[in-house]
Amino acid sequence: CLSFAVCSPRRHGKQYQGFGVRFTCVSGAYLVVSAVRRADATSASAVRVAPGATFASMSDRGYRRPRPLSPLREHLRDTFWFAPTTGFVCVFVLWLIATELDDAIVALLRREEAYDELSQLIAFSQDAKTIVTTISSAMMTFIGVVFSISLVAVQMASGQLTPRVVRIFVRSRISKLTLTVFLATFLFSLLVLSSYESETDPRLVVSVPLVQSLLILVLLGLSLLLFVVYVSATLRLMQVGPVVDKIARDSFRVLGRLPRGPGGEDDPGPETARVTHEGRAGVLRDVNTARLVRAARRQDVVLRLIPRIGDFVVPGTPVLAVHGGSVPPRHRLRSSVSVSVERTLHQDLAFGLRQLTDIALRALSTSVNDPTTAVQCLDRIVQFLAAVARLPLGTVHHRDRAGRVRLVQDGPGWDDLVDLAFEEIRWCVAGSPQVTRRLMAGLDDLLLLAPEDRKKSLLRHRELLVQTVERNVAVAADREFALLPDRQGIG
């Protein structure tokens, strides 16, 4: 979806390429758009845009489909062993290279008979040996203490917010980089210690670990720097604001990958067959839409995805319905649908709201009783719903190069997102005027932004909230106070 389509006179004649289309500035007020030839792009076309105009949406014939997730890549991102193992291999190769350099330096000095310089190098390496020994003995203790504290912090965050924040920690690049550098420093220090010789005579010594000693000092400095960054990132994970902000940013990233365009305009025809799920049971995490579109085009059929992204599927249940012909060959459908043990935000538009709602519900529970956290979650929920209020939602039609619908994918509609955002929270807010006031303000703001055909669900939740407060709050003045819209709750 393009935002602006205006070019200045000084850019006249320049071409730009992106989003699968090429833009040519032909005057200060008009822009010619021509499609770039791609496997999933439409035929070339040109569009003239009036001055100051914006693209509200683009047809789903030419959008860039989200790249499918690689099961191996996702498995490696969800584990903690791959990065340290890679670090071990890299640091071992680095040690071999440093050893060769040290041997070459000693051999060069002996050929030049520079025994005074060689004696100075031996003295430096002996002084550095004390530092290397200290590093090797203290590094594992340091690693254990740091990550023990970190795991306690993550446990506290998951208990106060939601268990889903553990996934944020596991997939954090800074966490894996810190662990990798710490362990690599420890391993490298052991390798350097094995390179020291007991011989100190410059005429007899074979190797002096000069480069190795310098590298271990560099790794030590990098470890200290990453320790500061890692502690800062872990402390942010314990705060509500940064966690909620990251969930919101990830949700908007998913929203940016969604196709834009009208749906439901082409009738797929009667259902002729179904394809069942034959893999392991799990949550539908990812759909390779490009592969399914190609398979449907070659078979000249229309495929319809039965479960939504985020649904739990078990072997033997139908995942695809075929319209207008026979089932495509199995090898063409292989790896087109991926499942996982839990939901992800890659293609799941509703999962961000699910996480925000979970945090709000945990905050409103009697064991936590933190309405301010619930208000922070409602801030992001209203922000997200305001962003999608005028966007096309629900069923998505994926088309081939000829513009024919080949894959129909059901997604959450406006009413589904509104119910997910407010239904459960509304059941728990009767005793918290701070949250009811923020909820009323959020609903009123969305009523101003939503089109007429989407106001019904908002009005329903607003009326149900009023009924909930009137039913649970006996004093009229308290009811009036609890239903007064306030974007800060009570401030």
Predicted regions: what they are:
Residues 69-85, 119-137, 162-183, 203-215, ...:
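Membrane-interface segments at loop-to-transmembrane junctions
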